[in-house]
Amino acid sequence: LDVVPAVQANWTSDPFTAEIRNDRIYGRGAIDDKGPAVAVLYALRAIKAAGIPLRKNVRFLLGCNEENGSTDLAYYLAHAAMPPQVFTPDGSYPIIHLEKGMLRLEFTKQTADPIVRFSAGTAPNAVPADASVSLSAAFCGTAEQGSQITCLGNKLAYKGVAAHASTPESGDNAITGLLTYLGSDAAFADCKALAQLFPHGCTDGSGLGIACADTESGALTCICSMLHVENGMLTGCVDI
């Protein structure tokens, strides 16, 4: 339920086995969105106990693929009718009456950049905290290395800060950080091009020329959330 994919190597315990340490529960999705789900059950129980008559039926739906495209919802709609009214109890107060539209894009390209393997991101709707790359040639970039970059032989890694795609400004995108660094070497033309489309620290889509904002919903958010290179094929994901 509302569980983002987990990279086992980034955990000191099994992410899918809840573990309590120092009065805190550790596990992937331990909070999201368990409290509100339980609150709905208690609310329905309270209505029933109080004998409050309902003019309409109430159906409680729990989906377990929300973080990866809600394919379970498609199955549900193929077997049951869409409810006339739906609300999701996962927001804050005051009541949220507006939600941004969402667009996810995937792109692929055969790259000539001297990259053996590039790996970053596990979920399309999250700012990745880690990015790593293995190179097939010596790196001759001019960018300042900075504390986020570590180098070990022909392997480079960037340590950023994870964040939800809806609030990317609170994170540090490891993909764009590493792309910016690699792009300072003329041999990494595709990395440089991507760094221009997704400037490090920019989250409003300015690099793509799509930045916009309004009073109610605020600024558009745009992140490169996943990027991988295998056998010369570059694949990426953009969350808008």
Predicted regions and their residues:
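Short helix-loop-beta-strand segments that form the rim/entrance of peptidase-like active sites
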Residues: 47-66
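Short glycine/serine- and small hydrophobic-enriched flexible loop segments
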Residues: 42-49, 179-184
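Midchain, well-structured core segments that form catalytic/ion-binding scaffolds
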Residues: 67, 74-75, 79-240
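Short glycine/serine/threonine-rich phosphate/pyrophosphate-binding segments
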Residues: 36-37, 69-72
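Acidic/His- and Gly-rich active-site-bordering loop/insert found
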Residues: 1-28, 49-54
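Structural motif
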Residues: 23-24, 58-59, 84-87
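Active-site alpha-helical elements of protease catalytic centers
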Residues: 29-44
